[in-house]
Curated annotation (Swiss-Prot):
Protein name, as recorded: Ribonuclease PH
UniProt keyword terms in alphabetical order: Nucleotidyltransferase, RNA-binding, rRNA processing, Transferase, tRNA processing, tRNA-binding
UniProt cross-references to HAMAP family, sorted A to Z: RNase_PH
Source domain of life: Bacteria
BP GO terms, sorted: rRNA catabolic process; rRNA processing; tRNA processing
Classification lineage: Bacteria, Pseudomonadati, Pseudomonadota, Gammaproteobacteria, Lysobacterales
Amino acid sequence: MTFSRPSGRTADQLRPVRIERAFTRHAEGSVLVSFGDTRVLCTASVENRVPGFLRGKGEGWVTAEYGMLPRSTHTRSDREAARGKQGGRTLEIQRLIGRALRACVDRNALGERTITLDCDVLQADGGTRTAAITGAYVALADAVNLLIKRGDIKKHPLIGAVAAVSVGIYRGEPVLDLDYPEDSDCDTDMNVVMNDGGGFIELQGTAEGHAFRRDELNALLALAEKGMGELFALQRAALAG
C-alpha cells in the first residue's frame, strides 16, 4: 500500500507557514503565525519591572501566557477564566513557551524589564504550541528591536533564534509537522524546540500507540532539523521585511 498523508503532503513537508508582523497596534511586538489552518496571535509586551526574585539584580525576565479561544476547535469550550482556573495543558504549554524564549535571551542585556509573550490560538488544527513558539520569537525580536531604537537598551539581548515543530510516526511512517487528523491518529507524537545554531532546547516525545525505536527517534529528529531550517529562514525573511 502506498503511504499518503491526509493533506497530500510528503513526509518531510511543512504545512504552508505565514508570519505576519505588526498584526495588532498596541503591543511592542505582534505576529499572526499560521501553520496551515492553525493560527496563533503572538504579542510581546514590555514592562519596566521584574518578578520579586529578580529585583535589584539587573536582570530581565521573559515569560509567556497561552490560551485558546472558545471556538478555536470543532466544538466550543468554556473560557478558562469562566472556570476560575487554568487547565494543566495550558500551564504546561505556556511554561514551555517561556522556557524556549528565555533560551535565546541575554537577560542581563535586557535590564530590569519583563517581556510577556501572549499566545492566543485563534484556530487550532494541530501544532499550536510549536506555532506559538515560532511566532512568539518574531514578536519578541520586534519588541527588543524597538527597545534598542528608543535607546532603552544598548546591547541586543537576543543571542539566537528559536523555533519549534512537531514530528511523529503516522501509520508507521515518520512525518513532519502533524495536522489534527494526523496528531489524533499517530503512534508517536513529538515536539522539538531548537535554536538556529543547531542546538536542541526541548524535546517532548510520547508513544501514543506503540513504543518507538532508536532508529525511529533518529528519523524524527532528522525531519525536525530539516523543518527547522525552513522555519528559521521564514523568521529571518519576516524580520527583514
